Amino acid sequence: MKEYKLENIRNFSIIAHIDHGKSTIADRLLESTSTVEQREMREQLLDSMDLERERGITIKAHPVTMYYEYNGEVYQLNLIDTPGHVDFSYEVSRSLAACEGALLIVDAAQGVQAQSLANVYLALERDLEIIPILNKIDLPAANPERIRKQIEDYIGLDTTHAIACSAKTGEGISEILEAIIELIPPPKLPEETELKALIFDSHYDPYVGIMVYVRVISGEIKKGDRITFMATKGSAFEVLGVGAFLPEATLIEGSLRAGQVGYFIANLKKVKDVKIGDTVTTVKHPAKVPLDGFKEINPVVFAGIYPIDSSDFDTLKDALGRLQLNDSALTIEQESSHSLGFGFRCGFLGLLHLEIVFERIIREFDLDIIATAPSVIYKIVLKNGKTLFIDNPTAYPDPSIIEHLEEPWVHVNIITPQEYLSSIMNLCLDKRGVCLKTEMLDQHRLVLSYDLPLNEIVSDFNDKLKSVTKGYGSFDYRLGDYRKGSIIKLEILINDEPVDAFSCLVHRDKAEARGRSICEKLVDVIPQQLFKIPIQAAINKKVIARETIRALSKNVTAKCYGGDITRKRKLWEKQKKGKKRMKEFGKVSIPNTAFIEVLKID
């Protein structure tokens, strides 16, 4: 680390919608400041996972410290890269709390999108200095002036200092570096001398254990300090070393001081011991009050994960345990299902988080897994006054003891070209949405605000929105409140036996259509047997839909050549009795493909 000067430190973040060029601009900044040598440079350097590179998204926050000489002074520029997706909005808010400014990157052809809007509002709440960056000006469709007007009219940001650039060609990158130094203020001189550091992320390293990423607000942290976490009131730990991101995590001599960004290692064993947003202080001279804004991260979406081969259960357990080391938001609980065997009930921050975990299990651990349909947490008030919170259809109580049920709702902002307005309104109506307001973003695009049940969002809302807007629509959501809903348990019976893996909680108005589509799908995927198999959808033991898999026909009279008809009748009667007995005692084997196909039903 170079000479410490508080007034020469700039802490900033980058806010951008998916595919607007955030990681590419970060690459150009690293190149221009010579933080990374040319031979070590690669695309999306800060995105370390293959999954991040392929999808073009940032999943984990990646800080990096750069040094840049300007007007004879050397400035320390700390970039705290953040995930852009709404699922990780709490992590984004804590990363922004560690900064004094942010770069708002907007595609000069596509314009402002929903997820960048959501994060801009988080930055404005923190009173950060926001510098608009109009990227991809090399594209033929780029229209920087139109995008400037969008930013001014809809977000209310002054675009006098907006910078037009092209991360691809490198045009405008030096102007961005100068704007960071000129416009983003240095960290404030702390009034306190006690250590107060904000945790904005953590990472498990197999060699050194847990690395805690911090922005020091006041005081300093160094090797040998005894520290504790204020919000969680945990036990004390000894700091074994402090480091900086240059751009790789590198241990340094000395200390991390007020305004600086870095990490420390201590004898911490689990990521769960370290909560994002918590305040670090010393045991000897503790700070009086913690930093504000801390809250526990609770999962929002739940799904069951089961191995296709039951012998892979221990491997799956190990895989989830390893993923949890770097993902404190992932919750895991062992569960069993009559039809799927042993597996895990997992909690996620949202649908993208769930998809990432599934994909990493398959890729990194080479496992074949089945996932049950995602569900949300329902609040059930019983007639005896007790309240239950359930996320699994198997935990649904007897309907006769339920007073009422409440479901979580979310506030949704959708940005779309005008021509798709009626299609989106029909989609939201089908999803039980309530329209709050419609605003013009510019001459061609609208912002629609809706309240929607979370259950409708986690299933297929994103896919359907992309479909009806030909890929041009984008949305973000934030959790709202619980509202009374007519949610019931739909059971699927195969050969009169309920199959728990197909059970789901649905709105009463959609139960019959959902039940019918599941029954029709199962008729196609369950192989025929020597007896008829009824497939039924039922609510509270009342059948609302039914399909039948016809029996395989076997010609038992094939060996009878002519002769008396009574011989044939005896054989037919015997076959009839045998089929009746098979229907009573026969087990229907459900192939794994059936579970996967049912999950694909809209």
From Swiss-Prot:
Gene3D superfamilies noted in UniProt: 3.30.70.240, Elongation factor 4, C-terminal domain, Elongation Factor G (Translational Gtpase), domain 3, P-loop containing nucleotide triphosphate hydrolases, Translation factors
SUPFAM superfamilies reported in the protein's UniProt record: EF-G C-terminal domain-like (SSF54980), P-loop containing nucleoside triphosphate hydrolases (SSF52540), Translation proteins (SSF50447)
UniProt GO BP: positive regulation of translation
Compartments it resides in: Cell inner membrane
Signal peptide region: none
EC number: 3.6.5.n1
Claim: Manganese is one of the keywords in the record: no
Ranges that cross the membrane: none
Catalytic activity: GTP + H2O = GDP + phosphate + H(+)
All residue ranges annotated as the tr-type G domain in the record: 7-188
Keywords, comma-separated and alphabetical: Cell inner membrane, Cell membrane, GTP-binding, Hydrolase, Membrane, Nucleotide-binding, Protein biosynthesis
Membrane topology recorded in Swiss-Prot or TrEMBL: Peripheral membrane protein
Domain of life: Bacteria
GO molecular function terms listed in the Swiss-Prot or TrEMBL record: GTP binding; GTPase activity; ribosome binding; translation elongation factor activity
Chain positions recorded as GTP binding sites: 19-24, 135-138
One Gene Ontology cellular component: plasma membrane
Keyword Electron transport: no
Protein task: Required for accurate and efficient protein synthesis under certain stress conditions. May act as a fidelity factor of the translation reaction, by catalyzing a one-codon backward translocation of tRNAs on improperly translocated ribosomes. Back-translocation proceeds from a post-translocation (POST) complex to a pre-translocation (PRE) complex, thus giving elongation factor G a second chance to translocate the tRNAs correctly. Binds to ribosomes in a GTP-dependent manner.
PANTHER family for the chain: TRANSLATION FACTOR GUF1 HOMOLOG, CHLOROPLASTIC, TRANSLATION FACTOR GUF1-RELATED
NCBIfam families with a match to the protein in the record: lepA (TIGR01393), small_GTP (TIGR00231)
Family: Belongs to the TRAFAC class translation factor GTPase superfamily. Classic translation factor GTPase family. LepA subfamily.
Protein name from the UniProt record: Elongation factor 4
Organism of this sequence: Chlamydia caviae (strain ATCC VR-813 / DSM 19441 / 03DC25 / GPIC)
Gene that specifies this protein: lepA
